[in-house]
């Protein structure tokens, strides 16, 4: 029996290099290692192609399509870049397409308006949302939609040891990019209000953002960057 060919397409900025891997790359790494098809999976990143300075996303996905257009691909996973869908659908019409949303769909090119989201619903085999909130945002103002191929799959962790509630500390963590797409502005707003109610709690942010626009008061949120590099 022929092995399945499964391609996972990372966003242009994401890398499989452990020194520069982002949230999407880490998610893909953590999930594929448990897949029974892991030997059939090929992960695509911009490192597979020559980089350009303009129209980077467009050239990245077009280069992928041109390179593999004569390859029989069974399943293609697109992560967090709905704008890639039209190209994939054109070049690989027989492939099953899954689209993963890691962020608010209304902030991503290719899913910002109602028509774009209707196109996604009609041209994918599965749509996977990494939180219920992300799913709710996708269906904002959409009516009479079929949810058969829609999955909400919240990101979880492996609980390695039990936690004694009597020993818990008053720390609340935010882990991720420090931007609005990740809800960091909401976290900071809540922290500022809650600290006035009970200043004994600590709000800690782990992450960074190259184009930072949110600057919380140091009295409300402590930003500590990244603690360590996750190795592949």
Residue ranges of each PLM-predicted region?
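Short His-centered aromatic/hydrophobic patch
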Residues: 78-84, 101
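A short, active-site helix/loop in glycosyltransferases that binds the activated sugar's phosphate group
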Residues: 118, 122-149, 157-159
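Short beta-strand->alpha-helix junction loop in the catalytic core
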Residues: 105, 134, 152-162, 210
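Conserved donor-binding/catalytic core segment of Leloir-type glycosyltransferases
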Residues: 128, 164-182, 188-195, 203-204
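Nucleotide-activated donor-binding/catalytic signature segment of Leloir-type glycosyltransferases, i.e.
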Residues: 212-230
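N-terminal strand-loop element at the rim of the active site
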Residues: 3, 8-72, 82, 209
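A short, histidine- and acid-enriched strand-loop-helix "catalytic/donor-clamping" loop
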Residues: 95-112
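Short donor-sugar binding/catalytic loops of nucleotide-sugar-dependent glycosyltransferases
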Residues: 12-14, 175-180, 194, 209, ...
């Amino acid at each position: 029996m022929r092995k399945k060919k499964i391609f996972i397409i990372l966003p242009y900025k994401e890398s499989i290099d452990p020194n520069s891997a982002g949230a999407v790359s880490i998610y893909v790494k953590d999930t594929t290692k448990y897949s029974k098809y892991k030997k059939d999976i090929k992960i695509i990143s911009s490192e597979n192609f020559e980089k350009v300075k303009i129209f980077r996303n467009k050239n990245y996905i077009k280069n992928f399509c041109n390179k593999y257009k004569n390859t029989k691909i069974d399943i293609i996973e697109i992560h967090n870049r709905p704008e890639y869908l039209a190209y994939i659908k054109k070049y690989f019409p027989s492939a099953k397409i899954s689209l993963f949303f890691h962020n608010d769909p209304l902030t991503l090119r290719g899913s910002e308006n109602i028509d774009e989201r209707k196109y996604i619903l009609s041209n994918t085999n599965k749509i996977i949302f990494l939180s219920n909130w992300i799913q709710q945002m996708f269906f904002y103002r959409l009516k009479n939609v079929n949810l058969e191929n829609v999955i909400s799959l919240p990101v979880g962790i492996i609980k390695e040891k039990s936690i004694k509630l009597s020993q818990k500390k008053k720390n609340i963590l935010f882990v991720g990019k420090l931007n609005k797409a990740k809800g960091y502005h909401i976290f900071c707003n809540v922290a500022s209000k809650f600290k006035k109610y009970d200043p004994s709690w600590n709000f800690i942010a782990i992450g960074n953002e190259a184009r930072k626009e949110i600057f919380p008061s140091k009295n409300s949120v402590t930003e500590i960057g990244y603690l360590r590099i996750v190795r592949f």
